[in-house]
From Swiss-Prot:
GO terms for biological process: response to hydroperoxide. NCBIfam families: PRK02101.1-1, PRK02101.1-3. One of its GO terms (cellular component) is cytosol. It holds the Pfam family H2O2_YaaD. InterPro entries: YaaA. Belongs to the UPF0246 family. This is UPF0246 protein Csal_3046.
Length: 262
């Protein structure tokens, strides 16, 4: 059983990683192809393409200009510790043991607009390129056209190699659209996290994102490898809600009284 998550816009390349183990991304050749396209964009055009401020556009133009393999611990960082944000706050990969890192390499993947599909310890250099970006390339008009075929095949293989043919989709809709779900050769379970608010269970973005990371970490640390085990997720006050779940869209809910203590 394997889980897949989205990357994060916020990056941390200042803090040293808590593991000396690292691997190389498997799609560096394709990443380099995208970098060459992006280098032709001025900061102003990047701002328009990516919908970001002039300051951020300038920063990312510089990142694209400086991007250079080969990757090493001196110029790159393992993806799972470079990404920050709500999901990664919940994941807290810096607290993983080496045994946890080994499991994560087999059981967790990170979708990326620039790197395609990352294992947790794959080295990355700083970038910003969301999967929904309409960056024209040889394969089509956007990054979905560029990545979908190879990522679908690669993710299917990774799920098979994990031992249990089940994919736990903890990615955002924007990123999971990079996968042709109909062609996956496995069962796909999509957890949804809802918090009680004024007597009703609703998706609260910050809590839901953090919960995706919490579930990913729990699956790794507890060595979860069956769907039945997944229903036992009980971190931070969440519990499986059979009444709200439908098919393989599994809803986990949390009472308002449990939020403060989480």
């Amino acid at each position: 059983m394997l889980s897949v998550i989205s990357p994060a816009k916020t990056l941390d390349f200042e803090t040293s990683p808590t593991t000396a183990t690292y691997t190389q991304p498997q799609y560096l050749e394709q990443s380099a192809e995208l970098i060459e396209i992006l280098r032709d964009y001025s900061p102003q055009r990047l701002s328009e393409l990516m919908g970001i401020s002039d300051k951020l556009a300038g920063l990312n133009a510089a990142r694209f200009a400086e991007w250079a393999p080969p990757f090493s611990p001196e110029n790159a960082k393992p993806a799972v510790q470079a990404f920050q944000g709500d999901v990664y706050q919940g994941l807290d990969a810096a607290a993983f043991s080496e045994a946890d890192n080994e499991v994560a390499q087999r059981r967790l993947r990170i979708l990326s607009g620039l790197y395609g599909l990352l294992r947790p310890l794959d080295l990355i250099q700083p970038y910003r390129l969301e999967m929904g970006t309409k960056l024209a390339n040889r394969a089509g008009k956007d990054l979905y056209a560029f990545w979908r075929e190879r990522l679908t095949q690669d993710l299917s293989r990774a799920v098979e190699d994990s031992g249990t043919p089940v994919l736990v989709n903890l990615a955002s809709n924007e990123y999971f659209k990079a996968i042709d779900a109909k062609r996956l050769t496995c069962r796909v379970i999509t957890p949804v996290f809802k918090d009680e608010k004024n007597g009703q269970f609703k998706i609260v973005s910050f809590y839901a994102k953090k919960a995706r990371g919490l579930m990913s970490a729990w699956m790794i640390k507890e060595r979860i490898d069956t769907p039945d085990d997944l229903k036992g997720f009980d971190v931070a006050g969440y519990a499986f809600n059979a009444g709200l779940s439908e098919g393989d869209t599994w809803v986990f809910t949390r009472r308002e009284s449990d939020v403060a203590g989480a």
